[in-house]
C-alpha cells in the first residue's frame, strides 16, 4: 500500500513472489514413510494365574493377556507381596476403603 490512507486499489494481491518454493535450510524431500505400519506390535500373550483369595483363601483363577514386559512386572508385584487377589464373594463386601 502506498499513501497515508489505505485503499482497495492499493492492495497488491500477487503474493507468489513472497512464497519460497523450497526450504532455505535444506532441500531435503520427505519420503512418505510407513514406519507406524511396519513396526511390529508387541504380541499379547495369554497368562493364567491360579492363586487363593487374600481374605478367605478360596481358589481364584484369573486369565489375562499382556505383553512380556507386563507379565514380568505383574510377576514381580505378586512375588514381592505388593499385589494380591480377591474372590468375587469377598469383593462384594469390600467398599474401597470406606
Swiss-Prot record:
Chief localization: host cell
Keywords of this entry: Activator, DNA-binding, Early protein, G1/S host cell cycle checkpoint dysregulation by virus, Host cytoplasm, Host nucleus, Host-virus interaction, Inhibition of host innate immune response by virus, Inhibition of host interferon signaling pathway by virus, Interferon antiviral system evasion, Metal-binding, Modulation of host cell cycle by virus, Oncogene, Transcription, Transcription regulation, Viral immunoevasion, Zinc, Zinc-finger
Post-translational modification: Highly phosphorylated.
Disulfide bonds listed in the record: none
UniProt-listed InterPro entries: Papilloma_E7
GO cellular component: host cell cytoplasm; host cell nucleus
Pfam families xrefs: E7
Motif (Nuclear export signal): 71-79
An example Gene Ontology biological process: DNA-templated transcription
Entry's localization field: Host cytoplasm; Host nucleus
unnamed zinc finger span: 53-90
Record text on subunit structure and interactions: Homodimer. Homooligomer. Interacts with host RB1; this interaction induces dissociation of RB1-E2F1 complex thereby disrupting RB1 activity. Interacts with host EP300; this interaction represses EP300 transcriptional activity. Interacts with protein E2; this interaction inhibits E7 oncogenic activity. Interacts with host TMEM173/STING; this interaction impairs the ability of TMEM173/STING to sense cytosolic DNA and promote the production of type I interferon (IFN-alpha and IFN-beta).
Family as reported in the entry's similarity comment: Belongs to the papillomaviridae E7 protein family.
Domain notes: The E7 terminal domain is an intrinsically disordered domain, whose flexibility and conformational transitions confer target adaptability to the oncoprotein. It allows adaptation to a variety of protein targets and exposes the PEST degradation sequence that regulates its turnover in the cell.
Protein name from the UniProt record: Protein E7
Gene from which the chain derives: E7
